[in-house]
Protein backbone atom coordinates (compact mmCIF):
# COMPACT_ATOMS: atom_id res chain seq x y z
CA UNK A 1 0.00 0.00 0.00
CA UNK A 2 1.35 3.40 -0.99
CA UNK A 3 2.05 6.06 1.63
CA UNK A 4 0.02 8.57 -0.41
CA UNK A 5 -3.37 8.60 -2.15
CA UNK A 6 -3.49 7.74 -5.84
CA UNK A 7 -6.08 8.05 -8.58
CA UNK A 8 -8.73 5.32 -8.55
CA UNK A 9 -8.36 4.82 -4.81
CA UNK A 10 -11.16 5.30 -2.31
CA UNK A 11 -10.84 8.05 0.29
CA UNK A 12 -12.92 8.90 3.33
CA UNK A 13 -13.75 12.57 3.92
CA UNK A 14 -14.59 13.42 7.54
CA UNK A 15 -16.17 16.81 8.22
CA UNK A 16 -16.21 18.81 11.46
CA UNK A 17 -19.42 17.04 12.57
CA UNK A 18 -17.83 13.61 11.99
CA UNK A 19 -19.99 12.91 8.97
CA UNK A 20 -18.39 10.44 6.56
CA UNK A 21 -18.22 10.59 2.78
CA UNK A 22 -16.73 7.74 0.75
CA UNK A 23 -15.17 9.05 -2.47
CA UNK A 24 -13.36 7.41 -5.39
CA UNK A 25 -10.51 9.70 -6.40
CA UNK A 26 -9.99 10.81 -10.01
CA UNK A 27 -7.41 13.38 -11.17
CA UNK A 28 -10.12 15.60 -12.68
CA UNK A 29 -12.79 14.81 -10.08
CA UNK A 30 -14.30 16.96 -7.35
CA UNK A 31 -15.94 16.13 -4.02
CA UNK A 32 -19.11 18.23 -3.71
CA UNK A 33 -21.28 18.92 -0.67
CA UNK A 34 -23.57 21.73 0.51
CA UNK A 35 -20.38 23.35 1.84
CA UNK A 36 -18.63 23.73 -1.51
CA UNK A 37 -16.22 21.36 -3.21
CA UNK A 38 -12.71 19.96 -2.92
CA UNK A 39 -10.75 18.97 -6.05
CA UNK A 40 -9.58 15.37 -5.93
CA UNK A 41 -6.21 16.64 -7.14
CA UNK A 42 -5.77 18.23 -3.70
CA UNK A 43 -5.89 14.73 -2.19
CA UNK A 44 -3.97 12.67 -4.77
CA UNK A 45 -0.31 12.51 -3.87
CA UNK A 46 -0.97 13.50 -0.24
CA UNK A 47 -0.72 11.22 2.80
CA UNK A 48 -3.78 10.00 4.75
CA UNK A 49 -4.68 12.48 7.47
CA UNK A 50 -4.34 15.49 5.20
CA UNK A 51 -6.50 18.47 6.22
CA UNK A 52 -8.28 20.37 3.47
CA UNK A 53 -10.80 23.19 3.07
CA UNK A 54 -13.61 23.36 0.55
CA UNK A 55 -14.28 26.37 -1.63
CA UNK A 56 -16.70 27.63 1.04
CA UNK A 57 -14.34 27.05 3.95
CA UNK A 58 -15.61 23.69 5.24
CA UNK A 59 -12.84 21.64 6.80
CA UNK A 60 -12.20 17.98 6.10
CA UNK A 61 -9.76 15.33 7.20
CA UNK A 62 -9.13 12.73 4.48
CA UNK A 63 -8.30 9.15 5.49
CA UNK A 64 -8.14 5.73 3.94
CA UNK A 65 -11.41 3.90 4.70
CA UNK A 66 -11.26 0.95 7.06
CA UNK A 67 -13.34 -2.16 6.45
CA UNK A 68 -15.89 -0.75 8.91
CA UNK A 69 -16.05 2.53 7.00
CA UNK A 70 -16.52 0.74 3.70
CA UNK A 71 -19.25 -1.59 4.98
CA UNK A 72 -21.25 1.34 6.35
CA UNK A 73 -20.89 3.50 3.24
CA UNK A 74 -20.61 1.00 0.35
CA UNK A 75 -23.24 0.53 -2.38
CA UNK A 76 -25.80 -2.02 -1.29
CA UNK A 77 -28.84 -3.83 -2.54
CA UNK A 78 -29.66 -6.02 0.45
CA UNK A 79 -29.50 -5.10 4.13
CA UNK A 80 -25.96 -5.65 5.38
CA UNK A 81 -24.63 -7.34 8.50
CA UNK A 82 -23.18 -4.49 10.55
CA UNK A 83 -19.65 -4.38 11.99
CA UNK A 84 -20.82 -5.13 15.53
CA UNK A 85 -21.91 -8.59 14.33
CA UNK A 86 -19.26 -9.19 11.66
CA UNK A 87 -16.37 -9.66 14.08
CA UNK A 88 -18.28 -11.96 16.50
CA UNK A 89 -19.39 -14.14 13.57
CA UNK A 90 -15.78 -14.52 12.44
CA UNK A 91 -14.67 -15.38 15.98
CA UNK A 92 -17.51 -17.86 16.56
CA UNK A 93 -16.72 -19.50 13.21
CA UNK A 94 -12.98 -19.39 13.93
CA UNK A 95 -12.25 -17.83 10.54
CA UNK A 96 -8.58 -17.76 9.56
CA UNK A 97 -6.15 -18.23 6.67
CA UNK A 98 -7.00 -21.25 4.53
CA UNK A 99 -10.35 -22.01 6.18
CA UNK A 100 -12.89 -23.28 3.62
CA UNK A 101 -16.21 -21.48 4.11
CA UNK A 102 -19.62 -22.09 2.59
CA UNK A 103 -21.60 -18.84 2.80
CA UNK A 104 -25.19 -18.44 1.76
CA UNK A 105 -27.31 -15.30 1.76
CA UNK A 106 -24.44 -13.13 0.56
CA UNK A 107 -26.45 -9.92 0.19
CA UNK A 108 -24.17 -6.95 -0.44
CA UNK A 109 -21.01 -8.80 0.60
CA UNK A 110 -20.19 -7.32 4.02
CA UNK A 111 -19.58 -10.69 5.66
CA UNK A 112 -17.80 -12.01 2.57
CA UNK A 113 -15.34 -9.11 2.69
CA UNK A 114 -14.71 -9.62 6.39
CA UNK A 115 -14.02 -13.35 6.07
CA UNK A 116 -11.82 -12.81 3.01
CA UNK A 117 -9.92 -10.13 4.92
CA UNK A 118 -9.33 -12.71 7.67
CA UNK A 119 -7.89 -15.14 5.10
CA UNK A 120 -10.77 -17.52 4.34
CA UNK A 121 -11.56 -19.17 1.01
CA UNK A 122 -15.28 -18.77 0.27
CA UNK A 123 -17.73 -20.77 -1.81
CA UNK A 124 -20.85 -18.61 -1.84
CA UNK A 125 -24.43 -19.09 -3.00
CA UNK A 126 -26.96 -16.28 -3.41
CA UNK A 127 -30.55 -16.61 -4.60
CA UNK A 128 -30.60 -13.25 -6.42
CA UNK A 129 -28.15 -12.50 -9.21
CA UNK A 130 -28.31 -8.72 -8.63
CA UNK A 131 -27.20 -9.21 -5.02
CA UNK A 132 -24.42 -11.56 -6.12
CA UNK A 133 -23.14 -9.02 -8.65
CA UNK A 134 -23.24 -6.24 -6.07
CA UNK A 135 -21.34 -8.35 -3.53
CA UNK A 136 -18.68 -9.29 -6.08
CA UNK A 137 -18.29 -5.64 -7.08
CA UNK A 138 -17.91 -4.57 -3.44
CA UNK A 139 -15.32 -7.28 -2.76
CA UNK A 140 -13.33 -6.23 -5.81
CA UNK A 141 -13.63 -2.55 -4.93
CA UNK A 142 -12.34 -2.86 -1.37
CA UNK A 143 -10.03 -5.89 -1.42
CA UNK A 144 -8.84 -5.84 -5.02
CA UNK A 145 -8.98 -8.28 -7.91
CA UNK A 146 -6.69 -10.80 -6.17
CA UNK A 147 -9.31 -11.43 -3.46
CA UNK A 148 -11.63 -12.92 -6.09
CA UNK A 149 -9.22 -15.86 -6.43
CA UNK A 150 -10.54 -17.01 -3.02
CA UNK A 151 -14.16 -16.04 -3.71
CA UNK A 152 -16.32 -18.29 -5.89
CA UNK A 153 -19.99 -17.32 -5.88
CA UNK A 154 -22.93 -18.58 -7.91
CA UNK A 155 -26.69 -18.17 -8.07
CA UNK A 156 -28.49 -20.99 -6.30
CA UNK A 157 -30.84 -22.15 -3.54
CA UNK A 158 -29.19 -23.50 -0.39
CA UNK A 159 -32.53 -24.88 0.80
CA UNK A 160 -32.07 -27.56 -1.88
CA UNK A 161 -28.41 -28.48 -1.35
CA UNK A 162 -24.97 -27.38 -0.18
CA UNK A 163 -22.69 -28.12 -3.16
CA UNK A 164 -18.96 -28.78 -3.52
CA UNK A 165 -18.05 -29.79 0.02
CA UNK A 166 -16.35 -30.59 2.27
CA UNK A 167 -16.13 -27.29 4.13
CA UNK A 168 -14.61 -26.28 7.42
CA UNK A 169 -17.34 -23.72 8.14
CA UNK A 170 -20.93 -23.06 7.06
CA UNK A 171 -22.22 -19.51 7.60
CA UNK A 172 -25.92 -18.81 7.03
CA UNK A 173 -27.76 -15.51 6.59
CA UNK A 174 -31.17 -16.37 5.17
CA UNK A 175 -34.76 -16.49 6.44
CA UNK A 176 -34.94 -20.22 7.29
CA UNK A 177 -31.45 -21.47 8.15
CA UNK A 178 -32.88 -24.62 9.74
CA UNK A 179 -33.69 -25.84 6.22
CA UNK A 180 -29.98 -25.81 5.40
CA UNK A 181 -28.86 -27.70 8.52
CA UNK A 182 -29.54 -31.20 7.05
CA UNK A 183 -27.46 -30.33 3.97
CA UNK A 184 -24.69 -28.91 6.15
CA UNK A 185 -24.27 -32.27 7.90
CA UNK A 186 -23.16 -33.85 4.62
CA UNK A 187 -21.00 -30.89 3.58
CA UNK A 188 -19.10 -30.11 6.79
CA UNK A 189 -15.88 -31.82 7.77
CA UNK A 190 -15.93 -33.44 11.25
CA UNK A 191 -15.37 -30.74 13.85
CA UNK A 192 -16.60 -28.09 11.44
CA UNK A 193 -18.55 -25.08 12.66
CA UNK A 194 -21.94 -23.70 11.61
CA UNK A 195 -22.97 -20.12 12.38
CA UNK A 196 -26.45 -18.76 11.64
CA UNK A 197 -27.43 -15.07 11.66
CA UNK A 198 -31.14 -14.62 12.44
CA UNK A 199 -32.96 -11.33 13.17
CA UNK A 200 -35.75 -12.90 15.27
CA UNK A 201 -35.65 -15.20 18.28
CA UNK A 202 -38.20 -17.54 16.69
CA UNK A 203 -35.76 -18.10 13.82
CA UNK A 204 -33.01 -18.83 16.33
CA UNK A 205 -35.25 -21.28 18.21
CA UNK A 206 -36.14 -23.19 15.03
CA UNK A 207 -32.48 -23.32 14.06
CA UNK A 208 -31.59 -24.73 17.49
CA UNK A 209 -34.31 -27.36 17.15
CA UNK A 210 -32.79 -28.51 13.86
CA UNK A 211 -29.39 -29.07 15.48
CA UNK A 212 -29.70 -32.68 16.67
CA UNK A 213 -27.23 -35.02 18.37
CA UNK A 214 -24.78 -34.65 15.49
CA UNK A 215 -23.97 -31.19 16.88
CA UNK A 216 -22.38 -30.01 20.11
CA UNK A 217 -21.28 -26.80 21.82
CA UNK A 218 -24.46 -25.09 20.61
CA UNK A 219 -24.97 -21.51 21.77
CA UNK A 220 -27.00 -18.44 20.84
CA UNK A 221 -26.07 -14.87 21.64
CA UNK A 222 -26.68 -11.27 20.64
CA UNK A 223 -24.24 -8.36 20.64
CA UNK A 224 -25.23 -4.98 22.11
CA UNK A 225 -22.97 -2.09 21.14
CA UNK A 226 -22.89 0.93 23.45
CA UNK A 227 -20.50 3.84 23.04
CA UNK A 228 -19.47 6.24 25.83
CA UNK A 229 -19.33 10.01 26.07
CA UNK A 230 -15.96 11.05 27.51
CA UNK A 231 -15.21 14.76 27.66
CA UNK A 232 -13.02 15.99 30.49
CA UNK A 233 -14.62 14.92 33.76
CA UNK A 234 -17.94 14.21 32.04
CA UNK A 235 -18.09 10.44 31.61
CA UNK A 236 -21.33 8.57 30.88
CA UNK A 237 -22.85 6.11 28.42
CA UNK A 238 -24.14 7.73 25.25
CA UNK A 239 -27.90 8.19 25.17
CA UNK A 240 -28.22 5.97 22.12
CA UNK A 241 -26.80 2.53 21.45
CA UNK A 242 -26.88 -0.05 18.69
CA UNK A 243 -28.90 -2.69 20.47
CA UNK A 244 -30.52 -5.73 18.87
CA UNK A 245 -29.76 -6.49 15.24
CA UNK A 246 -29.69 -10.29 15.23
CA UNK A 247 -29.12 -13.50 17.14
CA UNK A 248 -25.97 -15.48 16.36
CA UNK A 249 -26.22 -19.25 16.75
CA UNK A 250 -23.06 -21.37 16.57
CA UNK A 251 -22.59 -25.14 16.72
CA UNK A 252 -19.86 -27.72 16.11
CA UNK A 253 -20.50 -30.75 13.91
CA UNK A 254 -19.44 -34.10 15.36
CA UNK A 255 -21.28 -36.50 13.04
CA UNK A 256 -23.34 -39.54 13.92
Stretch-by-stretch model annotation:
Residues 100, 121, 191-193:
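Short glycine-centered segments of the SAM/dcSAM-binding site in methyltransferase folds
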Residues 108-119:
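Conserved SAM-binding loop of SAM-dependent methyltransferases across substrates and taxa
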Residues 1-64:
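N-terminal auxiliary segments of SAM/dcSAM-dependent transferases
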Residues 125-177:
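S-adenosyl-L-methionine
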Residues 96-107:
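Conserved class I S-adenosyl-L-methionine
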Amino acid sequence: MSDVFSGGERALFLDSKHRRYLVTLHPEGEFHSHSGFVPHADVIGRAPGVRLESTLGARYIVLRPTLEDFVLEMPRGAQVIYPKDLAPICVLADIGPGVRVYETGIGSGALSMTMLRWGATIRGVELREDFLNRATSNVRSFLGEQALERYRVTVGDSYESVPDGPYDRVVLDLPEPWQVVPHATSALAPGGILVAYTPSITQAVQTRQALDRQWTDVRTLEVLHRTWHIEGQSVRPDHRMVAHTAFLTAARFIGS
